Design a protein with these regions (language model features):
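Short beta-strand motif preference
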Residues: 124-126
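Short arginine-rich
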Residues: 158-174
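Structural boundary micro-motifs
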Residues: 103, 130, 166-170
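Short amphipathic beta-strand and strand-loop transition segments with alternating hydrophobic
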Residues: 109-116
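Low-complexity, serine/threonine/proline-enriched polar segments
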Residues: 169, 173-186
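A short, exposed loop/beta-hairpin motif centered on an aromatic-Gly-Thr core
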Residues: 128-163
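Short, flexible loop/turn motifs enriched in small residues
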Residues: 117-122
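Negatively charged, low-complexity tracts enriched in Asp/Glu with abundant Ser/Thr
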Residues: 2-109, 179, 187-201
Length: 201
């Protein structure tokens, strides 16, 4: 699909307004496009040029600028793009993988990955397995934000625990393997107890 070409200048207001009217936009997309219009109304060519530097079409600019701003919430300030022109995801610091369940076989355990931004804002990724069924997501600037490793881990453990608890006693014996689910829950409880004990010192 050919994306709409965008030439940002002080005469672009109608082009931007038409795009807003013709598309079902995410909240952040509409907000960014309204920034374009505000810059035009203020004759702020420098701001238009800055916005234009994030891509060569409406969609690329809004997505790239949104990604950059989400990264700022973690202290990532570098602006860089890959070859197709999409914003490069930043690398989180102090990442660690914590596994829960039967780690002797692939697919029999779940993994929580912790990481922090430059400003020490933490987040987590989660890959979960019920046996044959599962899912997950990686570390991202779109993830939930926490002020410490401990708070991120506590939230992630409770998140994973809730997922596993729902599957206890499931009649779907093909996808939801009870030994794997119960082993994962045991490891989660051990980790939660360990975190609690750390708060006593």
């Amino acid at each position: 699909m050919i994306m709409e070409s965008l030439v940002l200048n002080l005469q672009s207001k109608n082009q931007i307004s038409d795009y807003i009217a013709e598309h079902h936009l995410m909240h952040y997309e509409a907000a960014i496009l309204n920034e374009f219009i505000a810059a035009i109304d203020n004759n702020d060519l420098a701001q238009l040029q800055l916005l234009n530097s994030f891509g060569d079409c409406f969609r690329a600019i809004t997505m790239n600028l949104h990604a950059y701003r989400k990264g700022l919430e973690f202290g990532f300030t570098k602006i860089a793009f890959d070859q197709p022109g999409w914003f490069k995801r930043p690398a989180f610091l102090d990442t660690e993988d914590l596994q829960f369940g039967d780690t002797s076989r692939y697919g029999n355990h779940s993994t929580i990955t912790l990481g922090r931004g430059i400003n020490h804002t933490w987040t987590y990724a989660l890959h979960y397995s019920f046996g044959c069924a599962g899912g997950g997501y990686g570390l991202s600037v779109y993830g939930k934000q926490f002020k410490s490793r401990e708070s991120a881990l506590t939230f992630a453990l409770n998140d994973l625990k809730a997922m596993m608890t729902v599957k206890v006693g499931s009649s779907d014996t093909t996808n939801d393997k009870q030994p794997i689910i119960l082993a994962t829950l045991r490891d989660i409880e051990t980790a939660i107890i360990g975190l609690y004990q750390l708060t006593l010192f």
